[in-house]
Amino acid sequence: MTLRCLEPSGNGADRTRSQWGTAGLPEEQSPEAARLAKALRELSQTGWYWGSMTVNEAKEKLKEAPEGTFLIRDSSHSDYLLTISVKTSAGPTNLRIEYQDGKFRLDSIICVKSKLKQFDSVVHLIDYYVQMCKDKRTGPEAPRNGTVHLYLTKPLYTSAPTLQHFCRLAINKCTGTIWGLPLPTRLKDYLEEYKFQV
């Protein structure tokens, strides 16, 4: 998955990529820059965003990983910001995430794009497809007609996430109603910062 810039190739991608770390106050940012900065903050909390990494480095990291293991990295393509690298039955491959009109979706051929679900954040997109893969995958299935099935099942972490983050993931997997839990408001606020299961 690769995050596609709204700008044409060349300096546009570099300019937009630099907005991920925009230094200004939120009121100084354009709504687009604020959305991208928020998306990166959320993505950086995951532990599976690897930042700058080449295609070959991603392949090396995923080479011995089980099928369905994935990571997100900066794209080496000038028209995109992010790429998801995932291990398939045929080896590691890369997918693009497109960003348009404030929404993220998988990159695809034009005739399918309008049918693809769109998300407010990259993490929401990944969380959705991980959950979808859990629901659909019943076991190893031999590809037919040369087709390779692609599953997102397990993130490859840059380093072990904190125990707090693992606890937050466990709570998110058990309930969707954080504010109904008998917890202090400060802890509920922490849980609300990252509402995903992956």
Curated annotation (Swiss-Prot):
GO terms for molecular function: growth hormone receptor binding; insulin-like growth factor receptor binding; phosphorylation-dependent protein binding; ubiquitin-like ligase-substrate adaptor activity. GO terms for cellular component: Cul5-RING ubiquitin ligase complex; cytoplasm. There is a cross-link at residue 173 (Glycyl lysine isopeptide (Lys-Gly) (interchain with G-Cter in ubiquitin)). It holds the Pfam family SH2. Residues 1-75 are annotated as: Interaction with AREL1. Residues 1-29 are annotated as: Disordered. Pathway: Protein modification; protein ubiquitination. Expressed primarily in the testis, some expression in liver and lung. Keywords: Cytoplasm, Growth regulation, Isopeptide bond, Phosphoprotein, SH2 domain, Signal transduction inhibitor, Ubl conjugation, Ubl conjugation pathway. Ubiquitinated; mediated by AREL1 and leading to its subsequent proteasomal degradation. Ubiquitination is dependent on phosphorylation at Ser-52, by PKC and is stimulated by LPS. Phosphorylation at Ser-52 by PKC facilitates its ubiquitination and proteasomal degradation. Substrate-recognition component of the ECS(SOCS2) complex, composed of SOCS2, CUL5, ELOB, ELOC and RNF7/RBX2. Interacts with IGF1R. Interacts with DCUN1D1. The SOCS box domain mediates the interaction with the Elongin BC complex, an adapter module in different E3 ubiquitin ligase complexes. This is Suppressor of cytokine signaling 2. It comes from Mus musculus (Mouse). The gene is Socs2.
